[in-house]
Each structure stands twice: as structure tokens, then as C-alpha cells.
Amino acid sequence: MYEDCVKSTEDYYLFCDNEGPWAIVLESLAVIGIVVTILLLLAFLFLMRKVQDCSQWNVLPTQFLFLLAVLGLFGLTFAFIIQLNHQTAPVRYFLFGVLFAICFSCLLAHASNLVKLVRGRVSFCWTTILFIAIGVSLLQTIIAIEYVTLIMTRGLMFEHMTPYQLNVDFVCLLIYVLFLMALTFFVSKATFCGPCENWKQHGRLIFATVLVSIIIWVVWISMLLRGNPQLQRQPHWDDAVICIGLVTNAWVFLLIYIIPELSILYRSCRQECPTQGNVCQVPVYQRSFRMDTQEPTRARDSDGAQEDVALTAYGTPIQLQSADPSREYLIPSATLSPQQDAGL
């Protein structure tokens, strides 16, 4: 059965290999992940129309980009199930680092915004958060393009490289992604410090996601560079190790970060207005500073005029209702009693 499968499918024999079922299991998990990710994308599009808090809405475009990158990770699984050739090799070396760089850049941008929100400050606008995510991941895209271009133009095809050289180059291309992981880990820890407790739950989700991702990456890189050669399983286990790490990390993104974020977003959409007593407590030093300057709860609108603002349950400034100048308000005039009139 195994020989017939290899002869009939060549590079695609893992799709019908019954002796090594790792490929069948991983492709099944990848297909399920693709379906779940598409459903989550539709759910995000539906909830984006119902979110009223600007601080919550500003991060939604970045999370939508994050989901698109996760969808790409599940699709990339099939490039590792198919044997390494002149078509799958550039796809592997380019998309693996770029897609993970986009994911961790989105987490970094979200964590950077949370650092402000947990301290009661105003959120970045959605374009700023999105540009941070795209800009930070751009360097990994440039690195991957240069590497693939050099390999293809010099005539040194991937198929002619030794397995150890392929693995070393693959890991070296991911150094910037490892840096993004470490940076996101420390920035997410900074979200634990601040008076606004409601925003800290988002920071804890990012922290847990990055922590589990770091563990996954340490395991599969160690197995790829040290474990497989010592067990004399190189190159037979190389694709399986990378593919397992890829699918596992993609599911971690969904289960630890996206699905909890979606549930928090759904609960906040059901609350029409923030409850009293759940207001973000401003630190003492900020209150004393505002009392000294005699400008409590003042902000500027788009025209530059100062207006009264208040903080919602998430610490988001909202404008207080003011009187409509176009409407007439009648104030009753004061009248004197008969005794006071006689005295006059």
C-alpha cells in the first residue's frame, strides 16, 4: 500500500500514507481550523457594527488582520505535508516567518494600546494600531524576500541543500519573529499595572498566548536542530516537527486569544450603557494634579473647544450631555408673597 501510494502520488504521498498518519491528522486539524477561523471572521464583522465603545472598536481591525494571518497559517500546513520541491520550498521559507510576524505584531500593537488604557489614558486610533502591526511585521517580509531571491537567483536550489543546512537557514530566518515574541511578552506584562481592571483581562490573554507560543517554539526548534539528528530521524521527522508546531500554535491563537476576546466583545455589546460604580478609578496623583489646575474632567473636541467628559467602565472618555442652544428653556420668575408686597 505504501509503495503504491508513493508511485501514484510522488510528492503528495503523505496524503494517502497509512503507515505515518501524522499528515492525515494534521491536515484534518488544519481544515477544521480553516472553517473555525472563517466563522470567527464573520462573527467579528457582525460585532464590529454593534460596538459602541471607541476604545474597544479601535483594536478590531487589527484583530481582523490577526485572524487573516491565522487563516494563512492553517493553509500553510499543506505546504509542509507536500514534500519539499521547487514550488513548496519558497512558500515555506517566505510565508512561515511572515505570517507569524503579522500575528505577533498584532498582539504587540494590541498590548501597546492596553498599556495606555489600563492607566486611564485615551486609546490609539484604529489606524495607528493597524499601522503599528503592519509596520513592525514589514521587516520580516523584507528579510524573507531577500533570502528567497538570493537562493533562487544564485542557482542553489533548495532541493540540493543538505537537511541540516535547510533547518539552520529556516530557523535563522525566524530570529526577528523570536524578537517580536520576546518584546510582546514583556509589553503584555506591563498591562498588569494600572487602575483600570477591566482592561487587564485583555492583557492577561495576550500574556498567556505569547507564553504558550514561546514554549511551543522552544520545543519544535530544539527538536528540529538537536533532537532529530541525535535520534537519527533527520530528515524524515523534520517536516512533521515544523508542521506540528505550526498547527499547534495556530490553534493556541484561536483558543487562548481570539475566542475569549470574542466572548468579551459579545458581552460588552449586550450592555447598552456602563453601570454606575464601575467607573475606572483615576490614580491619586492624577486627581491631585487636576484639582491643582482647576480643570477636572475637561477635554477638547474636534473644534478645539473644551468640554466636560466622563470615564466609562473601561476608562474611556465620553462626552457629557450639554444643553441644546437652539431650544428655548423657560425659567420661572421669582414672585413676592402678599406680606412682602405690602411691606414694599
Swiss-Prot record:
Compartments, as annotated in UniProt: Cell membrane
Tagged with keyword Cell membrane: yes
Residues on Cytoplasmic side: 49-63, 115-123, 189-204, 261-344
Segments on the Extracellular face: 1-27, 85-93, 145-167, 226-239
Domain of life: Eukaryota
Transmembrane annotation, as ranges: 28-48, 64-84, 94-114, 124-144, 168-188, 205-225, 240-260
Induction or repression: Induced by retinoic acid.
Assigned GO CC terms: plasma membrane
Keyword line: Cell membrane, G-protein coupled receptor, Membrane, Receptor, Transducer, Transmembrane, Transmembrane helix
GO MF: G protein-coupled receptor activity
Keyword field contains DNA-binding: no
A Pfam family reported for this protein in Swiss-Prot or TrEMBL: 7tm_3
Gene Ontology terms: biological process: G protein-coupled receptor signaling pathway; hair cycle; keratinization
Tissues expressing this chain: Predominantly expressed in hard epithelial cells, including the cortex layer of hair shaft, the keratogenous zone of the nail matrix and in the central filiform papillae of the tongue.
Main location: membrane
Subunit and partners: Homodimer.
Function: G-protein coupled receptor involved in hard keratin expression and likely plays a role in the development of hair and nails.
Similarity section: Belongs to the G-protein coupled receptor 3 family.
Protein name: G-protein coupled receptor family C group 5 member D
Organism: Mus musculus
